[in-house]
Amino acid sequence: LSQPVNLSVTGPFKISSDNINFSNNVQVSSGSSEIFIKFSPTQTGLIVGEILLESPGAESVEVTLTGTGITVVHSYTAFNQQPLGFGGGFNQSASQVFSLHGDMSNIDKVKMFLQIDCPSSGCDDWDRFANVKVKDPASGNWFEIGRYITPYWVGTQQLDRGLEFDVTDFKSYLTGEVELRIYIENWTAKADIVTVEFDFVEGTPDYPYYAVSEVLGYHINSIDGVPYGVDHNFDLDKNIQIPNNTESAHLRTIISGWGHATPNDIGGRPCAEWCFRTHNVKINGSSMFQHYMGPIGCASNPINNQNPGNWQPDRAGWCPGMVVPVRSNDLDLSSTGSSFNFEYDFEDWVSDGAGGNAYYATSTYIVVKSSSQISSPIVTD
């Protein structure tokens, strides 16, 4: 060749003659023998591109390029083999400050994994209420980012990394120096040995800015929840004001029932562990969302080594050895406006006073997102 060579590339590839400046097109002299290629995929899996080489007086040449896009994940260990129990020098909770991922601009998802190992004495015999919280630096309050029920007798080793939670909603709190708290309502000296890890998954976030405020915070333990079937003074009505630059908003609720209050439902199902119910979320006085507290498939739990524990029968919205589901409800901003009234309305039922009390441990958060920096919603009684 006596003429310069023009190169052009397709797909998520860039080319350069100096390994510094990369673009879709480059021209090199006829004597050049080295070209640099940069692969910047925007999706996972096998990706194909092409380089076209052209020079006056010569036939063009096409070179196929292939690359495999993989997801970039930044992993951090928070609590590491932290024992939680009661008596024998153990505590039911532990809190600590950890350094988590700093730059959240290209983080699409945040996953949390929780593994329970057993001490030499074996794990706790019972299924226990348990959760993970992050401290809100502004208020000092603890926000519940995940709840689960421990398995009977065993840990979570049937799962490679234990229980998995999507905590992306709280990513504005899970960056830099973060204070976390773990809790298990374990009343024995058979301590649960807990490890918590976070995966920060790279990708294009739906919105660059998130903010969160707590609406209902009855999540200290299984019987700190809202009493069910009796009169109570728990405040379930709130006013929520969201920032004017909110582009997306949703409610995030975790709810689980406890207790064996009567009268039993058909089939001998007492409340609130076993009784199937449908609760309503009201916006400005109208029922907008329903939370069905029904079966979620306890018998199909992959942590299936919980015998002789009573793990297979379906509870109302939770299972031993499983994550308590998050109930996410998108808000229609065109109808709610920037200020609206919220009410959590439990299905009507009256306890007869026998069988003990019934409780619903309940947490609800308002999550707002925007393309510009956004402040937290204001929640008032």
What are these regions (language model features)?
Residues 1-71:
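Feature for long, exposed domains in two main contexts
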Residues 12-16, 112, 381:
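A composition-driven signal for long, intrinsically disordered, charge-rich low-complexity tracts
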Residues 68-380:
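Extracellular/secretory-pathway and virion-surface proteins
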